[in-house]
Amino acid sequence: MSLKQDLLKQLSQLKNERQSFEPHWKELAEYTRPRSTRFNTSEVNRGDRRNTKIIDQEAAKSERTLSSGMMSGITSPARKWFRLATPDPDMMNYSPVKMWLEVVEQRMNEVFNRSNIYQSLPQTYSDIGTFATSALAVLEDNERVIRTVPFPIGSYYIANGPDLTVDTCFREFSMTVRQLVMEFGLGNVSEQVKSMWDSGNYSQWITVIHSVYPNLNRISGKMDAKNKLFKSVYFEMGGDSDRVLRESGFDEFPIMAPRWEVNGEDVYGSSCPGMIALGSVKALQLLQRRKAQQIDKVTNPPMQAPASIKNQRISLVPGGITYLPMAGADQMIKPIFQVQADINGLIADIGDTRNQIKEAYFSDLFMMLQNINTRSMPVEAVIEMKEEKLLMLGPVLQRLDSELLDKLINRTFAIMARKNLLPVPPEEMQGMQLKVEYISVMAQAQKSVGVSSIERFVGFVGGLAQMKPEALDKLNTDEMIDNYAESIGVSPTIVSSNDQVAAIRQQRAEQQQQMQQMQMAQEAVAGAQALGNTPMDDNSALAALAGGGQ
């Protein structure tokens, strides 16, 4: 079996695994984000209307608020959102280490700003909020160092490794004949594509598969592209049965595939705001339709009229006249039934349903997070007002850290290291594994939930010290300051290290000791001078002392 045939077999198995999720995803897209899916490669550049099931846009607006709020609160390009650290906290007090980490963070931020990562992350957050699953490729780029490619839901298939994290991804997408030849070379494309190229059909779309999976057959010690930790193979879906476009590899898994919530061994996400709100979203469309029908019946009711004027012209415009025969008592045009125009109950129900959708999407919390970035709203205000929802988002944020942000930073760091874009680390850090600390608005808010306990404790001890000052002896102020600074995201460069504090205190103690010695010397001199000026009369103590010595 050729490599391509083996990969097509794997792809078929992955398609079967994903099949049960597709109807739910399609329904979510129909009511929230109709143009966000790509279940068929033929959907490229399709501009037909797809929002025919949406009457009330509350779900779409709430989803946009969630995406923007996560962008502002987790990975805002306007403020620092991560910090590198060493596993040993004492090492962070060493100035060369601290300065090296600061330079690396600055260069990584420059790479992020130069790349398209901040254009791709909003789609990642939208997908994970709507479909509970998202995927994003982080690739090397000669000009921008890294380049990201977000995958629309429906265009990729994933599988878990032994640790239940995603380590396999097959992506199905389209490329034009011109793009294929420019990317892979004319000698690597199928005979069908070569024929299209020769005949000038450069814009014809071709279905391509990109597969990334663990390279179980790699030869350890070899450094070539085919023996990396992860295998990468591009091939045409059709075309020659045994030809691939490119066979290479990656040193790190390049696909970030975060899930909102996962059930057991499932590969795809099992729950998210979009799934939770779907029932309310569908109910809202029905309520809006019923409200419109009721208003329509009031403003344009069904009418009844005498059969004798069936073929006559009837005027229903204001001021119009319709002539009727007067025979009979009921010869008039009138509504078939009178509709009561009270729609207040419907409006109240619509408002309640909208609030349910907003609550499912955490809209009020994410609106506050955006205000922090745009209006300098203090993080403490969010903590005080939305502490409960911050705690509810805790597991989601931890999963985002491990499945998205950690992998993004590790992948970017490794690419920069291979391109020699990082400074030489101090000798003390050679071979050391760094850790990442997140200091975004959301991360600070999560950590600062515990800051209030520190503040309450300090207030309690301060009040107690007014009655019993020795209570202050129980406070470890140095440790408290370090913990507080870390919780609220203060840069370590503006907090003095333990060595610096010890040196400052030693210098202060020496100065105080010198001042005490000088003061004691001055007091001794003053005492001697006073003693020398004392008169030696017979009744003085000095005379008695002098006499006693004779």
Regions found by a protein language model. Give the residues of each.
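C-terminal anchoring/interaction modules
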Residues: 1-30, 37, 300-550
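Extended, helix-rich architectural segments
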Residues: 1-203
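Exposed alpha-helical structural elements
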Residues: 6, 65, 69, 96-99, ...
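Structured, contiguous alpha/beta core segments that scaffold functional sites
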Residues: 12-13, 140-318
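Short, hydrophobic/amphipathic alpha-helical patches that form generic packing surfaces
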Residues: 30, 63-75, 276-287, 459-463, ...
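Long, contiguous amphipathic alpha-helices that act as assembly "spine/axial" helices in icosahedral shell
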Residues: 48, 63, 96-140, 270-303, ...
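Charged, amphipathic alpha-helical segments
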Residues: 111-120, 205-216, 464-467
